Amino acid sequence: MCIRDSDQIVLSVEAAQERFESIGFGDPDAAIRHVQALTAGVGRAAKINRIILPAVLQWLGEGQNPDMGLLNWRKLEENFGTESGYLGFLRDSTSAAQRLCHILSNSRFLGDALNKSVESISWLGDDDNLQARTREALDVQTGSALERFGSNINEFATSMRAMRRHEIERIGLSWMSGVISDSDSLKAMTDVYDAIIDASLTWAVRHQIAEFGVETAPAGITVIAMGRYGGREVNFSSDADAILIYRPADDADDGQANAFAKKVVEDLRNILQGPTTLEPKIELDLDLRPEGKNGPLVRSYASCEEYYESWASTWERQALLRARYAAGDAELARDFLINIADPLRYPTTELTEAE
């Protein structure tokens, strides 16, 4: 049954419930409350919602979780509806509105991300804005942050973590919109991690050179990517599995190099995952290092050579299959991969019974 009120057709409660159930909503009563809240009043947002919600509800119903999608739509308006022009943009861009509905009803991660940076919605109207940035472009941005925040770890950490959030969101929106493939999205996310970790290591090395009062670094330090990170399969919320290795410079003894490397790693971890900023952490997971959680966070090249030759277990050798250079001293990484990792992961002899 329908009644007319101010020239608008209003469904009875029973009919509205049936309508929402037929679309795919699991909780039609909650959906009705959301729609009532979104369309109440004479404000600009309410007027636009009254225009676009019929189509929006249908598009949300095509997703895996229409209820989550409508809740996310309401959260966007509560957070930004009176301050942003995003609703007007969606009214004028059918393709962007449809893409947004697909994202909100299928991805909790991206729904939460959009509620932190509503300006990203505008990307949905232009495929060029959804293209993953090249490594070169990422390096330009991190280089600028290094120059700007070279003496402030909190500001640098905030810039790096915000960049990760921003770029992973871009790639996620692109993937959900069908602009880039699964494999390209994973590679693009890995590039973001590589660029940020490399810049963070550079910041830490520069800071500790100043702290130690030396002109050059007493040690070269490299980040070897492992696990899914090493396999370039980073997703929205992946940790960065890694091994950290140092090698003393020609004019430095191992004691000084070790002390320097430890302080650099301390800075690196603070930038990526310390309590220096409210931006989400970038977890640098070092559990795959020699001796696992019992081993030092950063190990010398010579120590790695001895450990892998004499003590490495079968699973540690297998873990090296995905090892690759990620950041820092490229020559040190190359030596580790060629001289230590390759003979273990690509053996020329037959496996033993234990292996």
Placement of each model-derived feature along the sequence:
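Conserved phosphate-interacting/catalytic interface
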Residues: 1
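A nucleotide- and high-energy phosphate-metabolite-utilizing enzyme signature
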Residues: 4-355
